[in-house]
Design a protein with these regions (language model features):
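Core alpha/beta nucleotide-donor-binding catalytic domains of modification enzymes
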Residues: 2-109, 120-129, 135
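Short strand-turn motif at the edge of the Rossmann-like AdoMet-binding core
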Residues: 72, 115-118, 141
């Protein structure tokens, strides 16, 4: 399998493909963060780094079987200013569209998978229009102790969502940790009165529930 991964990061896509049992022949990665590239090459030294996605052409590559990527989400995310396609980072989605179109010149049946955040329906519809498919909504709370909704656009068929494992924070939090990691009395005296804390109270979760995004 020949794979082109856009916005590759530290190559989590390569990890997923390996765990799923796919045999990768060539893995081409578009990434500009030097630290992410360093991690990728340490784990997968055969990865061919192509650099800036805007300066790459799929026409210069061998026939591709799969194009994957998660274009920058800041312009779409409810946590940001929601500048949508006015945000230069969001416009990088169209590089995914361009490279997928180029990949189809050599392989009309090339598969693709695009990931992005939960967003307004109007932005979602634009992406769907360009890719020709509706997104699949996946919440990572099916297999982890966090609520993290993501959308996936793909022309790969024949798969189903996993059954929920019912995990909560209580299943993963280690309570036996050094004191230096515990919240201090000073925190309880000072922080709860701050505006930032008051605004974040809606995001507080007990151990009997899933967390927001885990770091």
């Amino acid at each position: 399998m020949n794979v082109l991964s856009l916005f590759d990061g530290m190559s989590c896509g390569q990890i997923a493909l390996n765990r799923a049992g796919f045999k990768i022949n060539k893995y081409y990665a578009c990434e500009i963060d030097k630290w992410a590239i360093q991690v990728t090459q340490a784990n997968y030294p055969n990865t061919q780094q192509l650099g800036d996605v805007t300066k790459v052409s799929a026409l210069d590559l061998p026939s591709l079987d799969l194009v994957i990527g998660g274009s920058p989400c800041q312009g779409f995310s409810f946590a940001g200013k929601q500048l949508n396609f006015e945000d230069p980072r969001s416009k990088l989605f169209f590089e995914f569209v361009r490279l997928l179109k180029e990949a189809r010149v050599k392989n009309p049946n090339v598969k693709f998978l695009l990931e992005n955040v939960k967003m307004k329906k109007e932005y979602q519809d634009v992406i769907s229009q360009y890719l020709g498919v509706e997104p699949i909504k996946v919440n990572s709370n099916l297999v982890s102790a966090q609520d993290r909704i993501r959308y996936y656009w793909t022309n790969i068929s024949g798969f189903t969502l996993p059954k929920s494992k019912g995990l909560t924070l209580d299943d993963i939090v280690d309570l036996d940790v050094p004191d230096k990691y515990n919240i201090t009395e000073r925190f309880y005296e000072k922080v709860p009165g701050t505006l930032a804390f008051k605004k974040s109270r809606a995001n507080l979760r007990g151990l009997e529930r899933c967390s927001k995004t885990l770091l």
